[in-house]
């Protein structure tokens, strides 16, 4: 991963998040009322459970990756290319580039070298605890209080690696989990019953101390196996209360269907983030509004790159329509873990977003999403 050139000092980052000295000097009421949480709610990280109030001192990134299999990018690129070809779309831009028009997902791109561009971190970092811990530790100076790792076993993520990174970096990390998408599923998914998948998800949640199911994905048309997994994730949510965030390969085709499947399985949409919707470039934000109206969250999760210019007008339209409480920000490991704060937020503020709105989106919304009242005791 490149040595990040931060566009904000720590003091500036904290102030734009609404938690610095300048923000503290504002009159009471200048920012939204503190987020409210159910009695007994916790945010589960790999090392400990936090009261949501304990993570109010900075931003939470809802979708990042700290470890992926060495062949992950190749498989991801092939799945993206197949989905785009099936929809007569041009090849996707590399991760960190402009999102595709008409709702196609972006490409993770190559890992590149350590001085490279917008791809995921290279294997020498993603498989070295000390190097990854150094990168994650840098986020503290950008005002980041917590990071969600959206990997799981079928993506090549080792939960013990994430625990060590959290311990060494001092940054609380929420572990995602589940089953990713058809090209990545273990072979047995096709023959497992929905009930068997529910049991496997609950076991994974217990053994790996998951704090969220995600990212849970589909690519083009949702396959029968993907539909089965989505239903199972919804039912596992009912048993565990863990929130859910998704991956949409072709957002314009699958976003609403993903939410439909989860809701039919018993999930309240306010426990769901539909991911990669920054890639669905639509001035009218039709799908985005529909999800917000139902109570769901919109994931703008490839921030800090050239694509910001196409995403910010959509965000501002949603903010002006009163949907700031439904937006979530992150970079999906494509642009450097701090760039959502240090590169992207100054652009959003320049477009007219207030400090109060930025605070709600980056500090309050992720805590409201991640907080849950556990139905099962923590194993580790």
Protein language model features and the residues they cover:
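N-terminal secretory signal peptides
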Residues: 1-9
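N-terminal export leaders
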Residues: 9-26
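Disordered, low-complexity segments in secreted/periplasmic proteins that are enriched in proline
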Residues: 33-35, 79-118
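Divalent metal-coordination and catalytic microenvironments
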Residues: 63, 147, 237, 298, ...
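Metal-cofactor-binding active-site regions of metalloenzymes
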Residues: 112-116, 123-124, 142-161, 166-195
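Distinct, well-ordered alpha-helical segments
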Residues: 160-163, 187-188, 223-228, 251-266, ...
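Active-site gating/metal-coordination segments in enzymes
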Residues: 164-168, 172-243, 294-297, 303-305
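Short acidic/histidine-rich active-site segments
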Residues: 247, 301-303, 324-338
């Amino acid at each position: 991963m490149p040595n990040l050139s931060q566009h904000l000092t720590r003091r500036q980052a904290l102030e734009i998040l609404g938690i610095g000295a300048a923000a503290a000097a504002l009159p009471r009421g200048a920012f939204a009322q503190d987020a409210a949480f159910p009695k007994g709610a916790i945010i589960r990280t790999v090392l400990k459970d936090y009261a949501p109030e304990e993570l109010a001192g900075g931003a939470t990134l809802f979708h990042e990756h700290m470890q992926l299999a060495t062949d992950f990018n190749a498989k991801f690129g092939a799945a993206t290319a197949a989905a785009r070809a099936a929809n007569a779309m041009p090849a996707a831009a590399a991760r960190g580039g402009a999102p595709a028009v008409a709702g196609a997902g972006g490409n993770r791109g190559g890992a590149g070298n350590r001085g490279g561009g917008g791809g995921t971190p290279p294997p020498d970092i993603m498989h070295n605890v000390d190097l990854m811990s150094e990168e994650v530790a840098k986020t503290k100076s950008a005002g980041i209080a917590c990071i969600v790792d959206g990997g799981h076993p079928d993506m090549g993520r080792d939960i013990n690696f994430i625990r060590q990174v959290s311990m060494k970096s001092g940054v609380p990390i929420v572990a995602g989990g589940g089953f990713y998408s058809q090209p990545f599923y273990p072979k047995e998914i096709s023959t497992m019953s929905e009930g068997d998948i529910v049991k496997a998800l609950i076991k994974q949640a217990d053994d790996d101390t998951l704090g969220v199911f995600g990212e849970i994905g589909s690519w083009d048309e949702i396959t029968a196996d993907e539909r089965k997994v989505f239903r199972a994730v919804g039912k596992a949510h009912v048993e565990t209360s863990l929130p859910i965030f998704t991956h949409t390969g072709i957002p314009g085709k699958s976003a609403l269907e993903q939410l439909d499947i989860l809701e039919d399985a018993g999930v309240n949409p306010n426990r769901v983030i539909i991911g990669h919707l920054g890639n669905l470039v639509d001035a009218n934000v039709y799908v985005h509004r529909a999800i917000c109206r139902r109570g769901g969250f919109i994931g703008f999760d490839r921030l800090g790159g050239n694509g910001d210019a196409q995403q910010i007008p959509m965000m501002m339209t949603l903010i002006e329509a009163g949907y700031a409480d439904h937006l979530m920000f992150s970079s999906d490991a494509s642009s450097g873990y701090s760039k959502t704060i240090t590169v992207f937020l100054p652009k959003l503020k320049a477009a007219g977003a207030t400090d109060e709105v930025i605070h709600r989106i980056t500090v309050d919304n992720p805590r409201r999403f991640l907080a849950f009242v556990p139905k099962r005791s923590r194993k580790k």
